[in-house]
Regions:
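Histidine-centered nuclease catalytic patch
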Residues: 66-130
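A structural signal for short, well-ordered beta-strand segments and their strand-loop junctions
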Residues: 62-63, 80, 106-107, 156-159, ...
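Active-site cores of enzymes that catalyze phosphoryl transfer or operate on phosphate-rich substrates
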Residues: 2
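Short, well-ordered loop/turn elements at secondary-structure boundaries
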Residues: 55-58, 100-102, 151-154, 160-161
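Short, charged surface segments at domain edges that flank catalytic/cofactor-binding sites
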Residues: 6-63, 90-91, 95-99
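C-terminal, charged low-complexity interaction regions
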Residues: 167-265
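Long, low-complexity, intrinsically disordered segments enriched in glycines and aromatic residues
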Residues: 121-179, 185-190
């Protein structure tokens, strides 16, 4: 999870909310008597909102930072809109969470879609290995886990190349005034150490290690090797996408990575 800098609210979302302030996000499958239009009735409206979220997030899952793939040949996108505060949990006087732009994120499918693109890497047969919004469900975790919109620019995580495991960098976390226990709950509640995600992170770490090894063999110092790799990979591509598992690369390349990063992240 990294900081997300939100862009301007999509036009169709703003127009719909202004005209239908109490509208539901989607039709309740149990309620066949629903009267009125829901947000998801219009595919163009949903797609515009999802695309703006993908742009804002550099096409990374708001929780695990895996890249968001679009499906081809009938496969499902590994991408969907998530409500940080459950859209169904609205108390008297609260905003309509379903249509609140500040409450919307875009995430991967968390491993629970068998027809997702690249299922061999992105689908899990064991529900205990699901992650991100799947485990979060309708739980109100606003005061329990971090909201990526409120994170600092600093990387508060550390990773282990031998396993791909994510842990809390307590020193950085405390220096940023963040609650270490809340950071650990974030990992736990979103199951960010799902074996599926750990394998993907380990692959990124192994690739970085191989790149560094090649440069060391060519005579470069470790600092120069890390700096040149950071300049090459720690940036958005032409489509505006960050590299998958951005924080993993940032951590592994250390101080040399920080010198290559351009704000905002």
């Amino acid at each position: 999870m990294k900081i997300i800098n939100k862009g301007v609210e999509p036009n169709r979302l703003g127009v719909f909310r202004a005209a239908n302030p109490d509208a539901l996000w989607d039709k309740d499958k149990k309620d066949n008597e629903l009267i009125g239009e829901t947000f998801r009735c219009c595919g163009a409206r949903y797609q515009e909102t999802q695309q703006q979220l993908r742009t804002d997030q550099g096409n990374l899952c708001a929780y695990c930072e895996q890249d968001l793939l679009s499906g081809t040949n009938g496969a499902l996108d590994d991408c969907r809109i998530e409500h940080f505060h459950p859209k169904s949990k609205r108390e008297q006087g609260e905003p309509n969470w379903g249509l609140d732009w500040a409450n919307l994120l875009v995430v991967c499918c968390g491993g629970n879609q068998s027809k997702v693109v690249a299922p061999e890497k992105r689908f899990d047969t064991d529900p205990e290995n699901y992650s991100c919004d799947v485990l979060k469900g309708d739980k109100i975790l606003d005061a329990i886990i971090f909201n990526p919109l409120n994170l600092p620019d600093a990387n508060i995580w550390k990773f282990y190349r031998s396993t791909g495991l994510i842990d809390v960098n307590e020193t950085v976390c405390e220096a940023q005034g963040l609650d270490v226990k809340m950071a650990r709950r974030t990992i736990k509640e979103l199951n960010l150490n799902s074996p599926r995600i750990m394998r993907a992170r380990k692959a990124v770490l192994d690739n970085l290690n191989n790149l560094i090894t090649e440069k060391l063999r060519s005579g470069q110092t470790i600092e120069l090797a890390r700096r040149s790799i950071a300049a090459s990979v720690l940036r958005k591509n032409k489509a505006g996408d960050w590299p998958s598992f951005f924080s993993v690369t940032r951590f592994y390349l250390g101080q040399q990575a920080e010198g290559s990063l351009v704000q905002p992240l």
